Amino acid sequence: MIPANASARKGPEGKYPLHYLVWHNRHRELEKEVRAGQVDIEQLDPRGRTPLHLATTLGHLECARVLLAHGADVGRENRSGWTVLQEAVSTRDLELVQLVLRYRDYQRVVKRLAGIPVLLEKLRKAQDFYVEMKWEFTSWVPLVSKICPSDTYKVWKSGQNLRVDTTLLGFDHMTWQRGNRSFVFRGQDTSAVVMEIDHDRRVVYTETLALAGQDRELLLAAAQPTEEQVLSRLTAPVVTTQLDTKNISFERNKTGILGWRSEKTEMVNGYEAKVYGASNVELITRTRTEHLSEQHKGKVKGCKTPLQSFLGIAEQHGGPQNGTLITQTLSQANPTAITAEEYFNPNFELGNRDMGRPMELTTKTQKFKAKLWLCEEHPLSLCEQVAPIIDLMAVSNALFAKLRDFITLRLPPGFPVKIEIPIFHILNARITFGNLNGCDEPVPSVRGSPSSETPSPGSDSSSVSSSSSTTSCRGCEISPALFEAPRGYSMMGGQREAATRDDDDDLLQFAIQQSLLEAGSEYDQVTIWEALTNSKPGTHPMSYEGRRQDRSAPPTPQRQPAPPASVPSPRPSSGPGSGGHVFRSYDEQLRLAMELSAQEQEERRRRARQEEEELERILRLSLTEQ
């Protein structure tokens, strides 16, 4: 609603009063207008920006401070899909980035606390269970899947209590962080106690989550980022990865040959599942570098490995303003001299001109096919039991956030006992739900409910044996001691030094790049073979056959891995200072990589042909016998 005095004014001042004041950096008048509360603080201007987005893009710090203090949403995206924080980084203004980052973290905490009662109600209604979520990483590039570790999340749910055990903690300084941790969520009436149990250090960090009684200033003070955190953002590219599913379609996978094809089903952890393929899934990665110095831009380019050069990725580079010639510059925030009348006129076409620092953007797009294994008879409910847990984990875990984005689609009926979704351009994540209520492997803290261990009357022996999982895993009883702090552990408050857990994709993206290189320095040169086998420069990774033989052979202390037969021996180092071998040319590296992929593909085709011939032979024999 626009106030009477604003509606009486003509032009942009009347239609977009907050935006107009932001444009002219009149922060004192903006404060009065916002305090009056008669204008929507999230109103969009003709270019798809909120007042906060416009203030950030223009670098008007005091206007941004006023809007943030009155609750402007930091998480909103503009028409181009960029957040307020990403636009703040583009300005290179350290104080502005620090301010926006502080309020972003504060608003996340408030939203998380406000959602506690809803989450508690969902947990209260859901049936108790124990389940294991196994994360595996796969890739179409041979041997690359080993660059990401696998992990099994163990989940206990009892009443309003939840516990998740993990060994994969996250990423810090471009490396994968491992440890033995438990996260306990213990619900109360309108609040919850959260414990992070560090089993390696025998320390328990506790925190009470409740929006009521929380002091706003204390929460804001706790969200204050360090200068190091701000500088790390200003010296790294802005990276965002999106899973575009607007054109997604699900189809049943087929099996068999020619006229003998049928809909595919597979057994997954004792459950018969229908296999679906999801097509038209696009993974879009956008990278902005206009805020980086030439030195840091050089580092980013140096991180590009030969592997990234031949991947099947459509890559577009956009220079400043996508090629628009900038002939006059009023300021860094308005390099193409756009006037207020032009900006606020919805009928005026700006073309490639825009506000803010000229954007240097790289966009990578690749199409993927996701897979689903759905069981209609599974005891777990995706919406009632699993979704609340994924929502809780997605707050601070980028992998769970992507899983949540996928399962919120309109999936075919059934529980997804296994899901394979793209995470990055060369990596898929395969998530498998198993050991429900400790039915596959006993869990000391879990025992089956007496009512769930007896098959229903009237069931014959064959049906009992074939559906043992579904009959004996319907319920369980979980020991209350699981949700208590272990004896002998030190108890500490919630304030502690910890790596920032950010659900942005940039740290994860860099961790994967670093794993691909796995060299002592980002300047080390790696060959295609080293990238594919994840070996350090100068080493000789063994062939696929050698690896297979090595698994079956007893361990030998001094075993030296042999180079693959199809790869020519690299030249010896030319001197004591040489850091490793280098192949003769990029063309040779590319040829070797494609050779390796072709061998892998040929092996898959050979196995498929062999299976089809065997099936055809069996069918012919069966027809002959008849």
Swiss-Prot record:
<feature type="domain" description="UIM 2">
    <location>
        <begin position="585"/>
        <end position="604"/>
    </location>
</feature>
<keyword id="KW-0967">Endosome</keyword>
<keyword id="KW-1003">Cell membrane</keyword>
<keyword id="KW-0677">Repeat</keyword>
<dbReference type="GO" id="GO:0140036">
    <property type="term" value="F:ubiquitin-modified protein reader activity"/>
</dbReference>
<feature type="compositionally biased region" description="Low complexity">
    <location>
        <begin position="449"/>
        <end position="472"/>
    </location>
</feature>
<dbReference type="GO" id="GO:0043231">
    <property type="term" value="C:intracellular membrane-bounded organelle"/>
</dbReference>
<dbReference type="Pfam" id="PF12796">
    <property type="entry name" value="Ank_2"/>
</dbReference>
<dbReference type="GO" id="GO:0005769">
    <property type="term" value="C:early endosome"/>
</dbReference>
<feature type="domain" description="UIM 3">
    <location>
        <begin position="610"/>
        <end position="626"/>
    </location>
</feature>
<dbReference type="InterPro" id="IPR003903">
    <property type="entry name" value="UIM_dom"/>
</dbReference>
<keyword id="KW-0007">Acetylation</keyword>
<feature type="repeat" description="ANK 2">
    <location>
        <begin position="80"/>
        <end position="109"/>
    </location>
</feature>
<keyword id="KW-0040">ANK repeat</keyword>
<feature type="region of interest" description="Disordered">
    <location>
        <begin position="534"/>
        <end position="590"/>
    </location>
</feature>
<feature type="compositionally biased region" description="Pro residues">
    <location>
        <begin position="554"/>
        <end position="573"/>
    </location>
</feature>
<dbReference type="GO" id="GO:0048471">
    <property type="term" value="C:perinuclear region of cytoplasm"/>
</dbReference>
<comment type="subunit">
    <text>Interacts with EGFR (ubiquitinated); the interaction is direct and may regulate EGFR internalization.</text>
</comment>
<dbReference type="GO" id="GO:0005737">
    <property type="term" value="C:cytoplasm"/>
</dbReference>
<dbReference type="InterPro" id="IPR055285">
    <property type="entry name" value="ANKRD13_C"/>
</dbReference>
<feature type="domain" description="UIM 1">
    <location>
        <begin position="503"/>
        <end position="522"/>
    </location>
</feature>
<dbReference type="InterPro" id="IPR021832">
    <property type="entry name" value="ANKRD13"/>
</dbReference>
<keyword id="KW-0472">Membrane</keyword>
<dbReference type="GO" id="GO:0002091">
    <property type="term" value="P:negative regulation of receptor internalization"/>
</dbReference>
<dbReference type="InterPro" id="IPR002110">
    <property type="entry name" value="Ankyrin_rpt"/>
</dbReference>
<feature type="repeat" description="ANK 1">
    <location>
        <begin position="47"/>
        <end position="76"/>
    </location>
</feature>
<feature type="region of interest" description="Disordered">
    <location>
        <begin position="595"/>
        <end position="614"/>
    </location>
</feature>
<dbReference type="GO" id="GO:0005886">
    <property type="term" value="C:plasma membrane"/>
</dbReference>
<dbReference type="Pfam" id="PF11904">
    <property type="entry name" value="ANKRD13_C"/>
</dbReference>
<protein>
    <recommendedName>
        <fullName>Ankyrin repeat domain-containing protein 13B</fullName>
    </recommendedName>
</protein>
<comment type="function">
    <text>Ubiquitin-binding protein that specifically recognizes and binds 'Lys-63'-linked ubiquitin. Does not bind 'Lys-48'-linked ubiquitin. Positively regulates the internalization of ligand-activated EGFR by binding to the Ub moiety of ubiquitinated EGFR at the cell membrane.</text>
</comment>
<feature type="modified residue" description="N-acetylmethionine">
    <location>
        <position position="1"/>
    </location>
</feature>
<dbReference type="InterPro" id="IPR036770">
    <property type="entry name" value="Ankyrin_rpt-contain_sf"/>
</dbReference>
<dbReference type="GO" id="GO:0005770">
    <property type="term" value="C:late endosome"/>
</dbReference>
<feature type="region of interest" description="Disordered">
    <location>
        <begin position="442"/>
        <end position="474"/>
    </location>
</feature>
